[in-house]
Amino acid sequence: MQLKAEYINFKYKKDKYILKDINLSVNSDEIVGILAPSGFGKTTLAKILAGYIKPEKGKVLLEGQNKIKKLFNPVQLIFQHPEKSVNPKWKMKKILNEAYEPSDQMIEAMGIKKEWLNRWPSELSGGELQRFCVLRALSPHTKFLIADEMTTMLDAITQAQIWKVVIKYCKENNIGLIVISHDKSLLDKVCHRIVNLEENHKEEIIENII
């Protein structure tokens, strides 16, 4: 399966274009990095790929077809700030089971403690909350996963644990993974190739990955 963006252009109202003629393709067996500093439209591109917003020009195709949102989006997006991605009026068990019920093995692998399931989002730390958001996105229906600065705000141990689970799951389930970050050292470690938005979409092939 392939997720493809063709000639994506986007600007906010009368501002200048933050995305101009972006072309990107990701296969279901790939890990592709998107590298750029703040202000280059990384998150906007992520939202377009996931169907949250529409480009001013261009299109996003899933297996050659215009991507249509169904009951569950096959392209899942994980944001940098997990507190903005959950319903504060729901307890964590309901949030986690919104799309599917993950196995006890997956819950344990993600480092989620059972007592957290009965807590409110406000009672968890950012790292604890992000574990739930990541696991929620790893549904059997997910075909492509977009990680937008997914672990930037987390400590090194939590980062390593989350990436280990995500990469293993994506490989085992043939899920395409798009890693969006300003941190090239992270992309060098986890990606097959990197697209640099700052350098005219220059592509770099990475030989050594986790």
Q: Which residues fall in each region the model found?
A:
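Conserved structural motif at the start of ABC-family nucleotide-binding domains
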Residues: 3, 18-19
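The feature captures the beta-strand-to-loop junction immediately N-terminal to the Walker
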Residues: 35-37
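Helix-to-loop junction immediately C-terminal to a conserved catalytic motif
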Residues: 50
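Conserved ABC transporter NBD signature motif
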Residues: 58-71
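Q-loop/switch helix immediately C-terminal to the Walker
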Residues: 81, 88-102
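Conserved ABC ATPase signature
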Residues: 120-124, 128
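Hydrophobic anchor residue at the start of the ABC signature
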Residues: 134, 146
